[in-house]
Design a protein with these regions (language model features):
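RNA-interacting cores
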Residues: 1-290
Length: 290
């Protein structure tokens, strides 16, 4: 098993006001639940999990927990960095009691295994295909060259997803250099580094609606971020690996501070078209207007 996702539905016995970003509350909850169950997690370096924000049944982010109301969040774990069997045992229980005395009442825990499908590594007819796809972003920020990128950059999205896939397969076919960057990564005989470069060159954003915000992380720390939706178009011969990257992004998130609930995304659609037929459609009758 490469990855494990737990979707946890819960409620509380008394009101909890989240004075900072709710991902900090969830990060503390996940860490304490694991440690109380004897599941060891590293305190320095990359965390073996990512989490979503706290959401209501309609998928809206909340900053206040009210008794009698249900909420949910998702935590995704990398099984080469943590004992995923132990994770299941830690979270499948009636309640979680935090060191601060707060009690979270668990209503339901749903587990899902992550298995990227890389079979074949290319489209069935070896033709280049056009993929139209969309993403709904919850608060997200991409790091790049000591800057924070607060718009839905396709290059940052695809690079982040590729690095996560490499991290998932770190002890198998993927090789990383000492700095943790992708270096000649091979998945099923595919040059992943070259693939993502080609993918970035052949992906364009065709529309987006986003808003920027500043996320308070506590202790005076503030992180710039954005949220909203974006539409992209990609041309590739390797549909299988491209789909695997979208699946990784949706399962583990993208960007920075994912263990604090940032970078949670939902792939809204993906439509695959044959490049030849798409060109024929584009060459059809057109009309110009104001």
């Amino acid at each position: 098993m490469l990855g494990l996702g737990l979707t946890i539905t819960f409620t509380v016995d008394w009101e909890v006001r989240l004075r900072t970003w709710g991902g900090r509350f969830l990060n503390r909850l996940v860490g304490e639940v694991l440690e109380n169950a004897g599941v060891r997690i590293p305190h320095n370096g990359a965390k073996p999990y990512t989490i979503s924000p706290i959401l209501d049944p309609g998928g809206r982010i909340v900053n206040r927990l009210v008794p009698g109301t249900t909420y949910w969040f998702r935590a995704s774990f990398m099984c080469n960095m943590i004992d995923c069997d132990g994770v299941v045992g830690a979270f499948v229980r009636d309640s979680y009691r935090l060191g601060s005395g707060e009690v979270v009442r668990v209503l339901r825990v749903r587990a899902r295994e992550f298995r990227p499908s890389l079979n074949g590594g290319s489209s069935s007819n070896n033709n280049r295909s056009i993929i139209e796809w969309g993403v709904e972003y919850y608060p997200t920020v991409f790091p790049f060259a000591r800057h924070y990128i607060t718009h839905p950059s396709p290059a940052r999205f695809l690079t982040s997803a590729t690095k996560t896939l490499a991290q998932l397969l770190r002890n198998t076919e993927v090789t990383l250099d000492g700095g943790g960057e992708l270096y000649n990564a091979i998945i099923n005989n595919i040059d992943t580094r070259g693939f993502v470069k080609d993918l970035v060159l052949n992906t364009e954003i065709v529309g987006f609606r986003v808003r920027r915000l500043r996320v308070g992380l506590g202790g005076g720390r503030v992180m710039p971020a954005f949220y909203g939706t974006a539409e992209y178009v990609t041309v590739t011969e390797n549909i299988s690996l491209f789909n695997a990257l979208l699946n990784v992004a949706e399962f583990f998130g993208v960007g920075k501070n994912r263990a604090l609930g940032l970078g949670f995304v939902r792939v809204t659609h993906r439509v695959v078209r044959n490049e030849d037929s798409a060109v024929e459609t584009i060459r059809g009758p057109t009309a110009l207007g104001n």
